[in-house]
Amino acid sequence: MQQLSFLPGEITPGERSLIQRALKTLDRHLHEPGVAFTSTRAAREWLILNMAGLEREEFRVLYLNNQNQLIAGETLFTGTINRTEVHPREVIKRALYHNAAAVVLAHNHPSGEVTPSKADRLITERLVQALGLVDIRVPDHLIVGGSQVFSFAEHGLL
């Protein structure tokens, strides 16, 4: 479980313990196969829970079936404080391994700034095109920065 550095202000040890227990419970339920990600909001909440407060950039993929239910989720690439190298071939390989009908792409910006960079936009385009060749949809690419999330889909960038 990550640190709670994304929470504003000071919290007592008791509050910290309560929050960590609640996060563990939510995390356990959200990792169960079959959890439906039928909206950006559901994926957003799952990702904030799992990525807020990370100190290095991570690129994660949520693998979904035809009903947008979670098959699996995993970190594919870990980078530095401001960059992660993403390889489309590996994303496709893992999506096919999981027999995914769709994937939600996600990465974090440890700086807290969620505006996508030019590199973020380019890799998203490449991944959408590459995954499309094997009939795998990309409903969204989300960028997590603290408790904020940027959705490529909501901004018309997919």
Please provide the spans of the model-predicted regions.
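Active-site-proximal loop/helix of nucleotide/amide-processing enzymes and allied scaffolds
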Residues: 2-20, 42, 67, 77-158
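Long amphipathic N-terminal alpha/beta scaffold segment
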Residues: 17-75
